Amino acid sequence: GDLERVDEIRKACSKEFVLSSGDDNSCMEFMAKGGDGVISVVSNIMPSQMVQWSNKVRSGAGLADDEARAFTALNDLVVFDTNPIPVKQALHFMDVFASPEMRLPLVAMEQDASKQLIDKMLSMGMV
């Protein structure tokens, strides 16, 4: 969506209205502009980190450069394939799921994409 509209929407709604982003890529900027939070794909992989970063941004502190790079890298993890396939594969690599099996209509990640995913996760210290 148009991030410039966050302030406009915030002013038009009551204080009780929860304004959430559905886009991981722009959610930090969305919250910095007054959004309340995000319905996030990435948070399935690193929930506590997303909470920490979200709280920091909403408080006005913003993300440090290394945090912003890590956030971008996490977003990059979930685009190796159609959602939720990369998330499920990542959770398998993290030993959260015992098996990488999917039920239809989902199918297993392509081997090349799976290798890229595990390599990225290893470089980030996630597994």
Task: Give the positions of each predicted feature.
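Catalytic alpha/beta core domains of metabolic enzymes, predominantly
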Residues: 1-79
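Short helix-capping segments at alpha-helix termini
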Residues: 11-17, 94-97, 126
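Surface-exposed charge patches
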Residues: 28, 89, 119
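Conserved short secondary-structure transition element at the edge of the structured enzyme core
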Residues: 31-36, 70-106
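Hydrophobic residues within well-ordered, non-membrane alpha-helices that form the packing/core
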Residues: 54, 90-91, 121
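Flexible C-terminal active-site loop/helix
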Residues: 97-127
